[in-house]
Amino acid sequence: MSTPAQKALLDALSQHQAYLYRASSQSVNELLKQFGSISNAQLLRLSELLEELTDTERKALQGLNFSGKGRASKRIEEIKASLNEWFDSLSVELSADFEKSAITLAVYEAAYAVKLFGEAAVAISGAEAYETIRKTPYAGGQLVDHLFKDIAASLRKKVEYVIRDGISQGQTNQQIVQRIKGKREKVDGGYSYTGGMLEAERHVIERQVRTARSHVSTSIYIDTYKAAGYEYVKVVATLDGRTCKYCASIDGDIYSIDDPARPRFPVHPNNRTTYVGCDKDGNIAGQRPFVMDERKVKDIPKEERKHLIGQLDANTSVGESKV
């Protein structure tokens, strides 16, 4: 394999991964903004409700099953209702916002995959494919449809634990809320809340969203290969220090495209391993064209085109680039 061909592939893959990362960052930032807005409003309400509790009600709250059916005092019932509203809003609103960006990604990746693999006659509807993708498990059984419902349920349990624990330790309402929201500190010239439960949850949301978007991209590629007539796929792992041992060990493995035992990437959070269509021996005949950029050709500066547009050997792999 010639060095120019290897470099062309690596540059092309790097450009596309950089684009996907930027697109995912935009989606993540929009979701985190919504997450912060909803959570801050509900925490303010929770703080007000905690201030209204009597000593007897605080003691009752310490041993409360928040999801229980039993009736409590009016003020405790208001706290339960406030938590219901908080986490229902997170589940519904974040899911809706993510779906919009995921459909946009699916449409883009469908067009990109056709262009990348030179299958001009293949037509994949990204929007239609997403309806199947959202109900297809990935990363050990996660479903896109349940992504934010699961995140909200997990966070709710943590918040309930902090309320109980804080009261049992004699913490003030302000201290309890601070454990959830964090402490306001100066960060990078501005102010932000750090060290709280919500900061940790932002990292969870970012990781889960990036993984879900990877699931969308990989699924679209598989649909494209099937439509193009490929019967086999080959594992393509990004081989660097961040690649897990499992993905590195199966790089280059070949599977029937319809094999139910075939790994469904992403198999773990932040997984960058995917598939390429091939024959039963793992080869893709001839040359394949690539235009590895979201911009139109006319909008790409001439000095960048040599890395983004051209022809390369269809059998060049990421693994071979290490040779």
PLM region descriptions:
Residues M1-S192, N283-V323:
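N-terminal leader/targeting and assembly helices and adjacent pre-domain segments
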Residues Y191, G196-M292:
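Acidic, glycine-rich two-metal-ion catalytic cores of nucleic acid-processing enzymes
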